[in-house]
């Protein structure tokens, strides 16, 4: 009997030792779609944004782009709170813009028409940030004025 017990223990040890190990790394819950994007939380939803904070990048914005993936957008960062005004010159995409106060609350959200150089889309009050996303993104996620963002 002891001889069989030794063989049994040896077989069990071999089987345990041959077991495939699980990888030691974990895939992040939300990996960025591609380099250069940052996740921001708008209310409770993630939007991947390209951040533009210098005058030339802010002036360029999303001009000339033909597509914007589903949960992506652009975050405009300004030096100080001010009344902001945007237009859609050379912008082919229908967008929504959310103006965000210094305390990171959405002041107002406006739909913007592609290639429309006429109207200016303006913040209701002094804003430090503006977020552009595909038209309807804010509404689909139940986001409205007064909701907060986390950077």
Ranges and model annotations:
Residues 1-6:
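Bacterial N-terminal signal peptides that target proteins for export
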Residues 14-17:
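C-terminal motif of bacterial Sec signal peptides marking the signal peptidase cleavage site
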Residues 19-151:
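Compact, glycine-rich, soluble single-domain proteins
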